Amino acid sequence: MKDARGLDVTTDDATAVAAADDFAARLLRLDQGVEAILDAAKRWPDTAIVQLYAATFWLYGQTDGALETAAVHLRACDALAMNTRERALHRALALWHGNDNLRAVEAMEAITTEWPSDLLTVKIAEFLYYVLGQQYMGPRFRAHMRRLEGAHAADPDFLAMTAFASELCSDYVAAEAVAERALGIEPRNPWAQHALSHVLIRQGRVAEGLTRLESFLPLLATCGRPIHCHDAWHLALLHLEELDVAAAMRVFRTHIWGITPDFVVEQLDAIALLWRIEMAAGPMDAQWPSIAEHIAPRALETFMPFMNAHYVYALARAGWTDAVEAALAGMRARSIAHDEEAMRVWAPVGRAVIEAAAAFGAGDRARAAALLDPVMPMMTSIGGSDAQDDLFRQTYLRSLQAAGRHADAAAYFDAITVGKSRTPLDRALAN
């Protein structure tokens, strides 16, 4: 049989294919209901594409428990009939499961080369660009999208990804135009709105950004929880650009923290917002204990340095010294492993960024500056997007200032704000 995009799938059950199509459509749109694939996996244990999509669902979880469950679905496929594309996807997902992220994205790019209609695999690859560092991988991401334009030129989900790839390459004119086109085709498109929010923040178009994102909130609440949280985080950042901490915290309480506090995306967005507020406006001491309770187990896991840097900062701010030391010990062990991911990012960059985040959270900003000095040129390889990695740019700036390295700080501030209309936040960070 064929799925909704004309791709061959190994089953004769139209209902199973419909379940797989439903998952693909919802994940592409970042919609609610993707978890329905888990019931589908129980109903069709012998259908490979359903098991592969169930594994995909769990791999997005980025926790040890989620990985264990993903492995069950991947192992189930070993005994199932699969066509060539399904076997290729199985291999790519197994590489992702093994934290072999660069090889996983290479495998997914190969799939979309042979089967350009496979837009879901493009979406999964987009997430792996995030794991590998979206700004760092931006040119590669954009090349991937350009290769597929002929097959998906009018697809709003493809256009949303294309807009984001353009933004990551600092082509803000193209990013904005493509995001607006995607929203014109499908207004309920949180990823296109996300790409647009990146453009507006990067250019310092704060008033316009606030208007656009506020207007999108009612629709956003009907989308999947991760993008609801994350697009709301961008709204809070726009409030922070105006140093409106009260408004940013209203968004924090209503849309970001405390709804699904064990979700990784909610944890990272909550930590990042509070961390930025602390650098701009002052301590947020009361917020850290509740976050620490939820993240302490996660801090021992090592999926990508970007995550661990957030976790150790939050634990340090909560005063959980033993948890910080345990997390740092796990990170150090990860950084001296001999696998490709350890050698690609953990040892040369990730370890220093995580150590610096812990030092910064504990108040030792001079040490944070010294740790970050040699690795900032490669910082974007630790994971996250350009907007997310601005957190570490601001941390480095504040560390330089606290260390009394004022000339270095002034030069760095100018470098990271070039081309942006200066906002109240920028003026606060400059001092």
Predicted regions and their residues:
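Generic helix N-cap/helix-start motif at coil->alpha-helix transitions
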Residues: 13-19, 45-49, 82-88, 115-122, ...
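Helix-coil-helix junctions within alpha-helical repeat/solenoid scaffolds
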Residues: 237-431
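Alpha-helical repeat scaffolds
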Residues: 33-40, 66-79, 102-112, 136-150, ...
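Residue at a conserved register position within TPR or TPR-like alpha-solenoid repeats
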Residues: 26-27, 58, 95, 125-132, ...
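Well-ordered mid-protein domain cores that form the structural environment of catalytic cofactors
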Residues: 78-163, 168-172
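Inter-helical turn/loop elements of alpha-helical hairpins
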Residues: 12-17, 22-46, 51-86, 91-102, ...
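Internal metal/ion-chelating core segments
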Residues: 143-242
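Structural motif corresponding to the intra-repeat A-B loop/turn of tetratricopeptide repeats
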Residues: 30, 61, 98-99, 132-135, ...
